[in-house]
Amino acid sequence: VRRVVVTGLGMINAVGHDKESSFKAILDGQCGIERITLFDASRQSVQIAAEVKDFDPTTVMDAREVKKADRFIQLGIKAASEAMVDAGIDESVERERFGVSSASGIGGLANIERNAIICENRGPRRISPFFIPSALVNMLGGFISIEHRLKGPNLSSVTACAAGTHAVSEAAKTIILGGADRMLVVGAEAAICPVGIGGFAAMKALSTRNDEPAKASRPFDAGRDGFIMGEGAGALVLEEYEAAVARGARIYGELIGFGESGDANHITTPAPEGEGAYRAMKAALTMAGNPKVDYINAHGTSTKYNDWYETMAIKKAFGGKENCPPVSSTKGQTAHCLGAAGAIEAVITLMAMRDGIMPPTINYENPDPDCDLDYVPNTPREAKIEVAMSNSFGFGGTNGVLIFKKV
């Protein structure tokens, strides 16, 4: 079986514009959640989010291309460029067997909203010719493949909050089955706009702690009352092991297992007791050969049911509370980046392995009796991490799990 390794990482989110500054901020427990500035949120019931501040897309794109690309694409290009440089990909690396696996939950939602208003108020002839190409989710992969001349498979995952994780597993499958030797994975999201915030708020999915932005996202805490929307992108360069070794690439880790499942339960609520999440974890563990897992980066959204059911699923997958490794959610820092979350958190997980340190679950102040695992509360923890798991679960009952191992 062809082995899949990770050789490059990149990310941008509310606490950092690159992987190193982001990871340091996450370890330091910095929270990127503040009052919304991307639009006037005064009429919204939820007025806080984790925005990427001071982002200049012209640092990674030609100014003429910027107007053709929605913000989620711009963020994705930034993370992808960092990952490619980090992997040491130069002109000598062959491009025909180098593909892209992109992900987003909602794509160009702000663009859709903006052009719908233009259509209603000024007529359809005033719609931007760049509207459709900038709004489609798969255009993230399209822009990136053009930018880096990647001529292998060009895939896209649109599975809500599990999309970034599924983009990794889809890329891995492509390499394992021989469809490519290298895949650039990018998950990106930028849905902080009136209809995005208003839509999630209407579902009662978001925290309404407008007066305490930095305390609003509190995974596994008894006082949690919903997630906070974030934006950003994560990127990983995946390579077939022998191809990576042949060019002398630095390897962050090997993807030794992945698992996917469907809840078939409810459009937004997870399956009772996290049954679907459990099956995804079990599938990943089985594929990986049931290794000892040293750390889990949880989906941990700060919603009542996700955190409760994910805890139950972890305990079932590992055969009881006493066998569970430490678990943390980094969504207290970055908020929930929706379709980008899985890619961002895969990057965080691999950096935790690299540096031998577990990121903390911040804002963990009041233990919930239903959430009774070790959540690495509030302070990072040094530890030898040989094997780590990353979980993502999305609306529609779609679940994805990744397991990485040091090489």
Question: Residue locations for each model-derived region?
Answer:
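Acyl-CoA/ACP chain-elongation machinery
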Residues: 179-225, 258-272, 300-307, 324-374
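Conserved beta-ketoacyl condensing-enzyme motif
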Residues: 6, 27-159, 188-199, 293-306
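Condensing-enzyme catalytic core mediating Claisen C-C bond formation in acyl metabolism
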Residues: 3-7, 30-34, 211-295
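ACP-dependent fatty acid/polyketide chain-elongation machinery
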Residues: 1-65, 242-254, 347-361, 405-407
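Short, well-ordered amphipathic alpha-helical segments that serve as non-catalytic structural scaffolds
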Residues: 76-85, 140, 167, 239-241, ...
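A glycine- and small-aliphatic-rich helix-loop capping segment at beta-alpha/alpha-beta transitions
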Residues: 20-27, 110-124, 174-177, 197-210, ...
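Glycine-/small-residue-rich "gating" segment that lines the acyl/pantetheine channel
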Residues: 121-128, 169, 173, 190-246, ...
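Active-site-proximal alpha-helical scaffold in enzymes
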Residues: 76-89, 137-148, 153-189, 227-249, ...
